[in-house]
Each structure stands twice: as structure tokens, then as C-alpha cells.
């Protein structure tokens, strides 16, 4: 049976997420990936990707477009990257961001500082046999993970990958670089 994935398409690296999920789902007949711009677009989805971008902008646009409550109440799995990790938390260090409270964790925005402080690193991620090339772009970190949150990866600055039930959140951008292992782990987790 196919998997239906939506990508929140308000701001950020939407096209990259759509392309990565399409490739990850290529061998699953009947699967689809679509941009999500309205609450009614969430119907019948198995999963939702909340992309990187600017978390305060995405938060504001979610409210403006009537998406905050529908996304916060979404029952499928959520794949959140960078700004998506910020939004998926239940506590954020910036009052301009209205967190969705999907994952019990505290997230600090822009923990890496300015754009010039962005970097790539080979990261050990729990469940992956080989290190993952992680692209951090003005990335957040989780400073605390709550009950039931599995920490998948951390760096000296903090926690950078977590799983909570069917949700996964990353401070980095797994949709960049062509390594789809984390997408596949996420998709396999939807079948639980």
C-alpha cells in the first residue's frame, strides 16, 4: 500500500523535501508526495514534513493560514528538519515562535550562530550503521529531551536528532546531499 506524504509548503526548502521523499518512496507503488498549504490538504496523509526555513516566519504563516491547530493535531508521523525541529518542540527559546508541542523537548534557535557558522559534519546517528553527512545551516539544538524522546544524535552544542513515537526531528538537513537513510527509517516507522 502506498504512503501519502505532505510537505508543509509555506516557506523553506520545500522542493528539496518533496524530491527526497519522492526518491525514498520510488519503490512503493501508490505513494505520493504533495505540498501542503491549507488545512484540508492534510486529510488522508500518513506523514508530514516540516521543512527547514525560518521558524518565526513559518510559525507566523501557519497562524495566518489556519494551519497551526490542524498541524498540532495531525495524527500521522512528522519529519521535522531545522526550523521544523524548532516548531515541533513543546518549548522554544524565542517567544516569536509558537511551538506545536509534537515532541517534548526544549529547543534553542540558531544555536550555531550566524550563517557563516554553518557547517557539515559526519554524524553518528543511532540506528545507522555508517555516519551520516549532516548539513547544519543556522541550526537549532535541543537542550532537553522529555519523557519518551529517543535521542538519536548529539554534538557538543546539544541534541541534534530525536525520535518520539512516529515523529522524528533533526537540527540538520537530511534532505540535502542524497543520503535517504533517515527518510527510510522514518517511513519504516510509520508502519509500526
Curated annotation (Swiss-Prot):
Matches recorded under InterPro entries: Class_I_gatase-like, PdxT/SNO, PdxT/SNO_CS
An annotated GO cellular component: cytosol
Binding site for L-glutamine: 53-55, 109, 137-138
Active site: 82 (nucleophile), 173 (charge relay system), 175 (charge relay system)
Catalysed reaction, written as an equation: aldehydo-D-ribose 5-phosphate + D-glyceraldehyde 3-phosphate + L-glutamine = pyridoxal 5'-phosphate + L-glutamate + phosphate + 3 H2O + H(+); L-glutamine + H2O = L-glutamate + NH4(+)
Keyword Endoplasmic reticulum listed: no
Entry EC no(s): 4.3.3.6, 3.5.1.2
Biological or metabolic pathway of the protein: Cofactor biosynthesis; pyridoxal 5'-phosphate biosynthesis
Stated family: Belongs to the glutaminase PdxT/SNO family.
Function: Catalyzes the hydrolysis of glutamine to glutamate and ammonia as part of the biosynthesis of pyridoxal 5'-phosphate. The resulting ammonia molecule is channeled to the active site of PdxS.
Name used for this protein in its record: Pyridoxal 5'-phosphate synthase subunit PdxT
Organism lineage: Archaea, Methanobacteriati, Methanobacteriota, Stenosarchaea group, Methanomicrobia
Amino acid at each position: 500500500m502506498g504512503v501519502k506524504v505532505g510537505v508543509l509548503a509555506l516557506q523553506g526548502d520545500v522542493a528539496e523535501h518533496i524530491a527526497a521523499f519522492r526518491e525514498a518512496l520510488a519503490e512503493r507503488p501508490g505513494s505520493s508526495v504533495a505540498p501542503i498549504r491549507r488545512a484540508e490538504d492534510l486529510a488522508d496523509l500518513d506523514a508530514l514534513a516540516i521543512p527547514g526555513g525560518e521558524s518565526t516566519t513559518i510559525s507566523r504563516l501557519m497562524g495566518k493560514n489556519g494551519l497551526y491547530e490542524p498541524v498540532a493535531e495531525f495524527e500521522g508521523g512528522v519529519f521535522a528538519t531545522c526550523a521544523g525541529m524548532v516548531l515541533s518542540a513543546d518549548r522554544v527559546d524565542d517567544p516569536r515562535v509558537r511551538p506545536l508541542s509534537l515532541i517534548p523537548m526544549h529547543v534553542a534557535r540558531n544555536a550555531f550562530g550566524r550563517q557563516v557558522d554553518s557547517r557539515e559534519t559526519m554524524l553518528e546517528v543511532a540506528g545507522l550503521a555508517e555516519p551520516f553527512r549532516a548539513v547544519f545551516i543556522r541550526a537549532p539544538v535541543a537542550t532537553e529531551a522529555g519523557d519518551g524522546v529517543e535521542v538519536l544524535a548529539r554534538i557538543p552544542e546539544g541534541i541534534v536528532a530525536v525520535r518520539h513515537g512516529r515523529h522524528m526531528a533533526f537540527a540538520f538537513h537530511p534532505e540535502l546531499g542524497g543520503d535517504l537513510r533517515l527518510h527510510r527509517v522514518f517511513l519504516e516507522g510509520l508502519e509500526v
